Curated annotation (Swiss-Prot):
GO terms for molecular function: asparaginyl-tRNA synthase (glutamine-hydrolyzing) activity; ATP binding; glutaminyl-tRNA synthase (glutamine-hydrolyzing) activity. It is an enzyme of class 6 (ligase). It catalyses: L-glutamyl-tRNA(Gln) + L-glutamine + ATP + H2O = L-glutaminyl-tRNA(Gln) + L-glutamate + ADP + phosphate + H(+); L-aspartyl-tRNA(Asn) + L-glutamine + ATP + H2O = L-asparaginyl-tRNA(Asn) + L-glutamate + ADP + phosphate + 2 H(+). Pfam families: GatB_N, GatB_Yqey. Keywords: ATP-binding, Ligase, Nucleotide-binding, Protein biosynthesis. Gene3D superfamilies: 1.10.10.410, GatB domain, N-terminal subdomain. Heterotrimer of A, B and C subunits. This is Aspartyl/glutamyl-tRNA(Asn/Gln) amidotransferase subunit B. Belongs to the GatB/GatE family. GatB subfamily. SUPFAM superfamilies: GatB/YqeY motif (SSF89095), Glutamine synthetase/guanido kinase (SSF55931).
Amino acid sequence: MSIIDTRTPEPKRFISGATGDWEVVIGMEVHAQVTSESKLFSGASTAFGAEPNSNVSLVDAAMPGMLPVINLECVRQAVRTGIGLNAQINLKSVFDRKNYFYPDLPQGYQISQFKQPIVGEGKIMISVGPDNKGQFEDVEIGIERLHLEQDAGKSMHDQHPTMSYVDLNRSGVALMEIVSKPDLRSSDEARAYLTKLRTIVRYLGTCDGNMDEGSMRADVNVSVRRPGGEFGTRCEIKNVNSIRFVGQAIEYEARRQIAILEDGGVIDQETRLFDPVKGETRSMRSKEEAHDYRYFPDPDLLPLEFDQAFVDALAAKLPELPDVKKQRLVETLGISVYDASILVTEKAIADYYEAVAEGRDGKAAANWVINDLLGALNKAGKDIEESPISPAQLGAIIDLIKEGTISGKIAKDLFEIVWNEGGDPKKLVEERGMKQVTDTGAIEKAVDDVIAANPDKVEQAKAKPTLAGWFVGQVMKATGGKANPQAVNELVKSKLGIEE
């Protein structure tokens, strides 16, 4: 099958070499474990973290006479994912045997799909950026196919000095292999693609996307060429298990290939591994050593067939996907595309934000969730589900600012108190004397005191009105941040004779 080049060369994506510009071409094969209670062809549990070899049926262990039975839920999840990828759903697909030997593959073959996958071509839109002007670029990435297959078990080589062990708990777990077209042109695009793909499957509930647990991992195909030239020889980097590592692996591999070509060498088509400690790829095996998998239809499984009504019923019940949610947040709550992009990255974050923003100013809610809450969660190493501050509590803090009960500075202090101690924000403001000072007389005295203590600044402010902000800051400091900032600003300008 010939590969079609769908991208026009873009100079901003080029890599500068010693002999001129180069273009990197990237395709990805993402293995996503299907979210289901049981495995693809057996009733064994898929629970992560169980004791070794405790979630293994006779089918998973390939005992003689044991026949596979398709798990309908895995089929549903694959179709739902295909719909979410704007892809063609194939009403007939076939399971094939992929023949190779490995200790953690007890059957001696993997049940996969080769010529007739369950999902055909699709596409997703990624946002790359921001650039130095703060702008994002939307790029369409083609999906070649999605097929269902069995995961293999796990070989463990660190349990004994002279022996290796095999854990078959993962053997037979359903995988969706999602294959992109070679449309990616930079490590940034690859990271954005993998992030978007993970977001989509998490919204759909078809894969948990936990790369640290191995439930989502990527094989990355990398080649380089002169801009707009023929495709180069590609190398495949296997089983990269984090988005950050994907970017690092691509950057290293592209530079490695460029250095070889500029030295007059040739690229060997091979499989490589990424070493995250050294930040480099190393050879695993050459393609010349690769197996002839001898695919043929599995005689124990009939072709998988369903009708369009089955697909339509699943499509009708899909949740709101990230692109649609982002557009809705921008249109209904008036927030920026940038803020909306951050908020929809995780469904739980988007749900939290919408709970905070309900009945409130969308921009203020976005500012607090993105800058304060997510910043605090990141610092504490917590997920949004572990937030010590509930949407109701954060919403109450925003309400207190809008009502003029507390200033923005006091709100930050209140946020810290609620984060560390919990409690009702409104009661805490009362109990701890955090209310904003709105008594004009008290504020005026504070303004007079600051002006009297800084006669030199007064003269400077008359020539340079922007210095009024310095006086406002001093008054806020003197009142412990409790003075109404607007009242302070008006009084300072009035006292200094600065006109609006």
